[in-house]
Amino acid sequence: MVLRTLFLVPLYSRNKSDWGEEMETYIVSFEINKPYEDWLTHFEQSRPGLDAADIAVLFRGPRKDDASKVCVILKANEGEVDKFMEANASMIAESGHVLESTVVDVYKS
């Protein structure tokens, strides 16, 4: 049996009422086909676009036992992450993110 425990620490403390919409937390896991450090460089270069879309990055990191598997946790207004990922699919793929491996879990605040 595999037991997974996830503790989310509020690293981003914007008040929901400041955003004016329902907030969503995205837990995105996927595989990469480049070294993690290369993927991370691409990801960090995308930060201005994420910031412009009011998407907060709460966490990003490789799986402890397999650096080709990555998890990113994001918080944003409803639908904003979907819009960002659709608009930037080619840039995301260039980073080494294997798009067809993506698993997204969305939680409401």
For each predicted feature, which ranges?
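Short S/T/G/P-rich N-terminal loop/turn motif that feeds into the first structured element of a domain
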Residues: V2-M91, H97, T102-S109
